[in-house]
Design a protein with these regions (language model features):
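Catalytic Walker B motif of ABC-type/P-loop ATPase nucleotide-binding domains
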Residues: 316-320
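Transmembrane alpha-helical segments in multi-pass inner-membrane proteins
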Residues: 13-104
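Helix-to-loop junction immediately C-terminal to a conserved catalytic motif
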Residues: 195
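The feature captures the beta-strand-to-loop junction immediately N-terminal to the Walker
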Residues: 177-182
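Conserved ABC transporter NBD signature motif
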Residues: 203-210, 222-223
Length: 396
């Protein structure tokens, strides 16, 4: 998912590994100076597992988790070493058994560690809305009516199955275009091909005059295409504002070192203000500091739209955005998309609610069995016998 936001997973993993290695090396240097003797014993597999369990026990998702876990495990270990010899001569062997039981219980009933339990009884921090800040840079929008996205002869095979068979269509700037069809027609596969999540076997995809057929997800995101997903992809333990903040990544410039040294506070304030503005824009402003996992599925989809808008895209691709929404929420989503069209943002969406699509889009592309069946205005598509047969079946 993060690749579609313009984030390099490889680079983040590499920097995390280098930082962890740096801290480990520094720890070893301090250990050698403290002990004045270096032995491999404290670094064997058993101790490695114990260090890992310290983080798990405290809570790896919290900054203080490792410290709390180390303190608890050390206290527990010292207590068992004093207590177990009173019950058996082989106290050290019993210690291993007791720790094994604790490991299993912790992984079964407290996967988030003890920190979530501790935080329940501590005063919750006061969440304040970000102060007004200078807006993040905006991208230039293409002139309305100009070709924005051109898909030509797109082909994708999975083994012997042609999921997408020579599909082609064009999306012009300032349009709302619907891509509809029965289940399994290949709509989401087309979206994945356009956004770089899948590579096509044949055909071309041109966006704003640039060939992006073989481009990766990061390059496509930076070019100005943002998307939502058929199956919601959020960080449920993070707040709404932090989830949407991920969408602003392609509009920020601070690097890893500047972030680590907290030299990017001004840019972060601008990004947080942008994230809050997008959350309010989609009608979730009152829940900005709630955890995303606490939202109903329909509102999680709306939150994905806010995250996509935070990237300031020229083209936003929505995969079933109205699924799980109530009728008033669907009407609100339709108004939001019409507002985006007025602002110059182009929308391409897949949706199974045909009535929702018919009342919203400018043009419709219908797919069936991986091929484009028909393309045209909503009224003409609705009346087309081929579309009716694809949805309802033929009369024998």
């Amino acid at each position: 998912m993060v690749e579609s936001l313009g984030i390099s997973v490889f680079r983040i993993r590499l920097m995390s590994f280098v930082l962890a290695a740096l801290l480990a090396g520094l720890s070893g240097w301090l250990y050698a100076h403290m002990s004045r003797y270096v032995s491999p014993a404290p670094f064997d597999l058993r101790m490695g597992i114990q260090y890992l369990f310290m983080a798990i026990l405290g809570g790896s998702g919290h900054i203080l988790g490792a410290v709390v876990g180390a303190a608890l495990l050390t206290l527990l270990q010292n207590g068992l070493q004093d207590l177990l010899p009173h019950f058996a001569e082989n106290g050290q062997q019993l210690e291993v058994i007791v720790f094994a039981i604790i490991y299993v219980l912790a992984l079964q009933f407290a996967r988030g560690g003890v920190m979530p339990f501790v935080l329940r009884y501590l005063p919750k921090p006061v969440r304040q809305a970000p102060a007004a800040a200078e807006p993040l840079p905006r991208r230039s929008m293409p002139q309305a009516g100009m070709p924005l996205l051109t898909v030509q002869d797109l082909l994708k095979r999975f083994g012997g199955l042609e999921a997408v068979s020579r599909v082609g269509f064009e999306v012009k700037a300032g349009e709302i275009v619907g891509l509809i069809g029965p289940n399994g027609a290949g709509k989401s596969t087309v979206f994945n091909l356009i956004t770089g999540a899948l590579k096509s076997d044949q055909g071309t995809i041109v966006f704003r005059g640039q060939d992006i057929t073989r481009a990766g997800q990061r390059r496509i995101a930076k070019a100005g295409i943002a998307r939502t997903f058929q199956h919601v992809k959020l960080r449920p333990s993070m707040t709404l504002i932090d989830n949407v903040l991920l969408g602003t990544y392609v509009r920020t410039r601070s690097g890893f070192l500047a972030s680590a040294l907290r030299l990017d506070r001004a840019e972060e304030a601008r990004a947080r203000a942008e994230a809050l503005a997008q959350i309010k824009r989609v009608g979730l402003g009152e829940q900005a500091f709630d955890q995303a996992g606490n939202l109903p599925l329909g509102r999680q989809r709306i939150l994905e739209v806010a995250r996509a808008l935070a990237a300031d895209p020229a083209l936003i691709i929505l995969d079933e955005p109205a699924a799980g929404l109530s009728r008033p929420e669907k009407l609100g989503l339709a108004d939001l998309l019409r507002g985006l069209r007025k602002e110059g943002v182009t929308v391409l969406l897949v949706e199974h609610d045909v009535e929702f699509v018919m009342g919203l889009v400018d043009r419709i592309v219908v797919m069936d069995f991986g091929s484009k069946l028909v393309e045209g205005l909503p009224a003409a598509v609705r009346a087309d016998p081929r579309v009716q047969e694809a949805y309802l079946g033929s009369v024998v």
